[in-house]
Amino acid sequence: MKKTKFFLLGLAALAMTACNKDNEAEPIVETDATVSFIIKSGEGRAVGDGLADAKITKLTAMVYAGQIQEGIKTVEEADGVLKVEGIPCKSGANRVLVVVANHNYELTGKSLNEVEALTTSLTAENQNAKNLIMTGKSAAFTIKPGSNHYGYPDGTTSDNLVSAGTPLAVTRVHAGISFAGVEVNMATQYQNYYSFNPADAKIAALVAKKDSKIFGNSLVSNTNAYLYGVQTPAGLYTPDAAGETYELEASLNTNYAVGAGFYVLESKYDASNELRPTILCIYGKLLDKDGNPLTEPALTDAINAGFCDGDGTTYYPVLVNYDGNGYIYSGAITQGQNKIVRNNHYKITLNITGPGTNTPENPQPVQANLNVTCQVTPWVVVNQAATW
């Protein structure tokens, strides 16, 4: 009889530890309620205009009472997660719903402060839109015993309908920077000497922030770690001061094409620290007027003038979302300039009117041979125009 009793208890324990397809964690506290919610992801697209927007394939939702995690549930769906249903939790006032999407964090049991202190680093995986972390946090609300539904439409059967018709907003931690187009219209004084072919060029991000917070009004980290996609001569913007690091990240370099660009992290251009602006640069061989590589003495003349480096490569850098250099902006720049902001897509249009520079991480003359226009529309998208 005693053996039979222990056997039945063992079966019960196994049943309690079984996982369902939604990866539902065991309730952290005694529960008398459930929360379900619908998400609203920011309108978006991948950096390339023609690419499909990435789906949320993994979403973890946590319910907090102060610092205490009272409930957690993770849902994974290859076709995209639009809602999370039936999070076991405890009723009470001043509860907060926190969500993290497309992530690899271990979140079970973490306090609210611990979750909000999480950071991420820019890696090659982030250049695929499906690997972009998204986060969201609700205002405080009351959970009642029974079923609670957040963001569901009016008329939903529920013991407590919260934020009816207004789903929980979930937004990307990353921003996008890209070239919407590059045209070459050499000014009269250069037409008989130089040309440039964007079709054979490459693009790279320079002085891109390596780390970022994933929660907060500003996600700019306190670290002084930066990444570059191509090594160029040091300039005023190059992170080389004490405590700064500057590393190669090969994924921040690709062939030029209309719409080509990169996902990057939030950054603030600190004037007291020589700006450290995130730069999007197109580069390639400076050519003669007939489209051929420069030969002597024209190559030496171009090198001495600072138009190209020793192998004839010229760079056309654009300081992304920078207020200056004659850049022209259109669209709703609602979050200010001189910084990179999450969930913004900075789309840059260039008009090249002359040779570039051999030091793209240096300030350029006001009358540089690059016209830049930049547009901001949802994602949010910032359209920026520049003329060299």
Curated annotation (Swiss-Prot):
Membrane listed as a keyword: yes
UniProt keyword annotation of Membrane present: yes
GO biological process: cell adhesion
Modification after translation: Synthesized as palmitoylated lipoprotein precursor. Efficient export to the outer membrane and integration into fimbriae requires lipidation and subsequent proteolytic removal of the lipidated propeptide.
Region (Important for oligomerization and fimbrium assembly): 379-388
Signal sequence region: 1-18
Major place of residence: other
Keywords attached to this entry: Cell adhesion, Cell outer membrane, Fimbrium, Lipoprotein, Membrane, Palmitate, Signal, Virulence
Gene3D superfamilies named in the record: 2.60.40.3690
Subcellular location: Fimbrium; Cell outer membrane
Covalent lipidation (N-palmitoyl cysteine), chain numbering: C19
Lipidated residues (S-diacylglycerol cysteine): C19
Gene Ontology MF annotations: structural molecule activity
Positions of the propeptide segment: 19-45
Gene Ontology cellular-component terms listed: cell outer membrane; pilus
Residues with site note (Cleavage): R45, A46
InterPro entries listed in its UniProt record: FimA_C (IPR053878), FimA_N (IPR029141), Fimbrillin (IPR008110)
Miscellaneous section: The name (major fimbrium subunit) does not indicate the abundance of the protein, but is derived from the greater length of the major fimbriae. In strain ATCC 33277 and strain 381, major fimbriae are 300 - 1600 nM in length and about 5 nm in diameter. In contrast, minor fimbriae are only about 80 - 120 nm long. This length difference is observed only in a small number of strains, including strain ATCC 33277 and strain 381, and is due to a loss of function mutation in FimB, a protein that restricts fimbrial length in other strains.
Complex and partners: Fimbriae are composed of a major, structural subunit (FimA) and the minor components FimC, FimD and FimE. Head-to-tail oligomerization of FimA molecules mediates assembly of the fimbrium stalk, while the minor components probably form the fimbrium tip. Linear, head-to-tail oligomerization of FimA is mediated by a conformation change, facilitating the insertion of a C-terminal beta-strand into a groove in the N-terminal domain of the following subunit.
Family: Belongs to the bacteroidetes fimbrillin superfamily. FimA/Mfa1 family.
Protein role: Structural subunit of the major fimbriae. These long, filamentous pili are attached to the cell surface; they mediate biofilm formation, adhesion onto host cells and onto other bacteria that are part of the oral microbiome. They play an important role in the invasion of periodontal tissues. Fimbriae and their constituents are major virulence factors. FimA proteins from different strains have highly divergent sequences, and this has been used for classification. The sequence-based classification correlates with pathogenicity.
Protein name: Major fimbrium subunit FimA type-4
Species the sequence originates in: Porphyromonas gingivalis
